[in-house]
Design a protein with these regions (language model features):
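Active-site-proximal specificity loops/subdomain of glycosyltransferases
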Residues: 36-87
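Short, polar loop motifs at secondary-structure junctions
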Residues: 12, 32-39
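N-proximal low-complexity "stem/linker" segments adjacent to membrane-targeting elements
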Residues: 1-14
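Short, well-formed alpha-helical segments that are part of the catalytic scaffolds
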Residues: 12-24
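Short loop->beta transition adjacent to catalytic acidic/histidine clusters or analogous donor-positioning motifs
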Residues: 2-3, 24-31
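C-terminal catalytic/acceptor-binding lobe
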Residues: 170-252
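Short beta-strand-to-loop acidic/aromatic patch adjacent to the donor-nucleotide binding site
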Residues: 88-97
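Conserved catalytic core of nucleotide-sugar-dependent glycosyltransferases
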Residues: 99-185, 247, 251
Length: 252
């Protein structure tokens, strides 16, 4: 089985490079950088940049309308693993503000959940087409037939079968659509296996019960500095935008 870890970023950060270099398991380690120039080298991490115009013209666009740039790093990641190198059986996609609690977490989660086509936080369904319940439902209108499904996918694992179905969608429509709807919806539409591991349930935003572990500052939530006892092995946490805390809290 051939697997990859793809960390999505604007540009490399030493914390993320170190994390990828130290990850356990037999993975290709890829950092997909949205900027055209990287200026970083590593013996075990491959740094990939993709020209905006090429990605857009090939139909890999519109995956994240929440950011001003189109194509986004997500569009480029789909372009790379759907067209440039579709050889991987499984690919982990991880945004740079996701904190992975251990260098063993990905291989451990892979071992637990086996051959699912999509590992993600949730798989919420809408069947009636009413878009008032969630701001982003409108992004599915005229892009895919009902039912629609959603999940935060800032950390997710995708199979070769699902990547092929995403490629088929681009080939037929010459576009993508909002990532938090598209990935789950295409998976479910094609009767693929979607699993929501407990290890991904700390991917926010969602309500917290008991002790607060996030703070709201300057219009955004982020994880506050706290005791290492709050970090659970194999869990993924989002958002943690202070990259220095990744090194501080990582268990090994």
């Amino acid at each position: 089985m051939k697997s990859a870890i793809c960390l999505l970023c604007v540009e490399p950060h030493p914390t993320h490079v170190k994390f990828l270099e130290n990850i356990s398991g037999d993975y290709s380690k890829i950092m997909l950088c949205d900027r055209s120039s990287v200026g970083y080298t590593s013996d075990s991490v491959e740094f990939i940049t993709i020209d905006d115009h090429i990605c857009y013209s090939e139909g890999y666009k519109n995956m994240n309308y929440c950011v001003p740039k189109n194509p986004s790093a997500w569009d480029k990641a789909m372009y790379y693993f759907c067209k440039i190198d579709p050889s991987y059986d499984y690919v982990w996609f991880i945004e740079d503000d996701v904190f992975v609690s251990s260098i063993h977490a990905l291989s451990n989660v892979d071992n637990i959940y086996g051959h699912a086509d999509l590992l993600c936080k949730e798989n919420t369904i809408i069947t009636d087409g009413h878009t008032s319940g969630w701001t982003h439902w409108t992004q599915a209108v005229d892009r895919h037939p009902l039912p629609w499904y959603i999940s935060m996918i800032c950390a997710c694992r995708v199979s070769k079968s699902l990547l092929q179905k995403i490629k088929d969608y681009v080939d037929n429509n010459h576009r993508l659509f909002f990532l938090e709807i598209m990935v789950n919806t295409i998976a479910m539409r094609n009767q693929l296996i979607v699993v929501n591991p407990i290890e991904l349930q700390k991917i926010m935003p969602s309500s917290e019960v008991g002790k607060r572990v996030r703070q709201y500052k300057h219009g955004k939530y982020t994880w506050v500095q706290q005791s290492i006892d709050h970090v659970q092995p194999n869990y993924f946490y989002h958002p943690m935008k202070d990259f220095a805390l990744h090194d501080k809290f990582r268990l090994n």
